[in-house]
A protein has these predicted regions:
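Cationic, histidine-enriched alpha-helical/coil surfaces that engage anionic ligands
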Residues: 1-144
Length: 144
């Protein structure tokens, strides 16, 4: 077996493994907890890194098409994770010095959290559509 055949075999094995895990979890996305979604986001990063590592042995057009279905999912999941982090940060800020927090602080915190929660609902709807598109996309490494 020459080096390019060995590299392709390695890549196919890794890509199939990561893709199987991502697809299995994507099918359960609507029922996942925030922690499970965060873990899915990390698994998707592993798939993306594997794709990046193996990309040069496949036609660019096929790789890019697959990456284009994965990219918006990662962006939206990242945003949803940021919303959770912001909520925790605001909560921590307000509880750190309860006597120093003025009504204006609570009002501002409510506006910030409310705005992000509204955006998160829209983002989540788009995320579900993106996931369905991803699940319908054929893996480029399975093409002959």
């Amino acid at each position: 077996m020459d080096l390019s055949a060995a590299a392709r075999k390695f890549c196919v094995k890794q890509l199939k493994k990561q893709n199987r895990i991502v697809r299995k979890n994507c099918q359960k996305l609507k029922k996942m907890s925030e922690e499970e979604r965060h873990n899915l986001r990390l698994v998707m990063k592993k798939l993306r890194y594997t794709i990046d590592f193996c990309a040069n042995i496949y036609p660019d057009k096929q790789v890019l098409k697959f990456q284009k279905t994965l990219s918006p999912i990662q962006s939206r999941m990242g945003y949803l994770n940021d919303v959770l982090a912001a909520e925790l940060l605001v909560e921590k800020m307000l509880s750190a010095e309860p006597n120093a927090a003025t009504p204006a602080w609570f009002y501002t915190a409510g506006i910030v959290i409310g705005w992000h929660q509204r955006e998160a609902k829209f983002t989540e709807k788009k995320l579900f559509k993106d996931v369905n598109r991803f699940l319908d996309t054929k893996a480029f490494w399975d093409r002959k």
